[in-house]
Amino acid sequence: MAHSVKIYDTCIGCTQCVRACPTDVLEMVPWDGCRANQIASAPRTEDCVGCKRCESACPTDFLSVRVYLGAETTRSMGLAY
């Protein structure tokens, strides 16, 4: 089951999340909305393994990239509420 990867407009274009992703889910794309003129994009969410390394690597106070685990993965990890 694929996970949902969301990129928020608080992204500063630092590339930390892209470099941290072991499955190359993320890439940088041109965007005029930040100083770096690029923003992270998640075109291959079907390859996301849910490790959340991208979240850990994000230096912004409000995480600019978030991984939302699929329900099946959440249950198997014992995280369901």
Curated annotation (Swiss-Prot):
Main localization category: plastid
Chemical reaction(s) catalysed: reduced [plastocyanin] + hnu + oxidized [2Fe-2S]-[ferredoxin] = oxidized [plastocyanin] + reduced [2Fe-2S]-[ferredoxin]
Superkingdom field: Eukaryota
Gene Ontology MF, one: metal ion binding
Cofactor notes: Binds 2 [4Fe-4S] clusters. Cluster 2 is most probably the spectroscopically characterized electron acceptor FA and cluster 1 is most probably FB.
Cofactor(s) listed: [4Fe-4S] cluster
Enzyme nomenclature, EC number: 1.97.1.12
One Pfam family here: Fer4_7
Keywords of this entry: 4Fe-4S, Chloroplast, Electron transport, Iron, Iron-sulfur, Membrane, Metal-binding, Oxidoreductase, Photosynthesis, Photosystem I, Plastid, Repeat, Thylakoid, Transport
Topology within the bilayer: Peripheral membrane protein
Localization annotation: Plastid, Chloroplast thylakoid membrane
Domain called 4Fe-4S ferredoxin-type: residue spans: 2-31, 39-68
InterPro entries named among the record's database cross-references: 4Fe4S_Fe-S-bd, 4Fe4S_Fe_S_CS, PSI_iron-sulfur_center, PSI_PsaC
Family annotation (PANTHER family): PHOTOSYSTEM I IRON-SULFUR CENTER, PHOTOSYSTEM I IRON-SULFUR CENTER-RELATED
Complexes and interactors: The eukaryotic PSI reaction center is composed of at least 11 subunits.
Protein name, as recorded: Photosystem I iron-sulfur center
Species assigned in the record: Chlorokybus atmophyticus
Lineage, highest ranks first: Eukaryota, Viridiplantae, Streptophyta, Chlorokybophyceae, Chlorokybales
